[in-house]
Amino acid sequence: FNEQVFRSVPFREFAFPFTFAPKNKKEMLNVEKIIKLFKFHMLPEFSNKTKSAFLSPSEFQITYYYRGKTNDYIPQISRCVMTGMDVDYATEGTFHTFREDDRGAAPITTTMTCTFAETEIMTKETIAKGY
């Protein structure tokens, strides 16, 4: 006789990989800004000058769209926090760069994978609503 004990429902997690292949310096600088922006919003901040407590990191509302409209074929995702980020500067297996400038040599391709966790536990009721 086997018995299973129900303990909890884990928060759903989602990973989204984004590969960037900038064609020029302007696009390369935009990739750098995107990566810094996600890093910034992933982390908490101190709530006071004594640095004894944190404020929660930014929340994200992820929605799938197709041609400007919500894509109802893909389940909805409730509000999330970003729980991880991996940046791969050797997307093709080898590290390749543009010509160096005064800052160094920027990578030709970059893959940023962002991991998100929902802040709401899913139930049968939320799944029935399209989540």
What residues fall within each predicted segment?
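Acidic, Ser/Thr- and Gly-enriched intrinsically disordered low-complexity segments
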Residues: 1-131
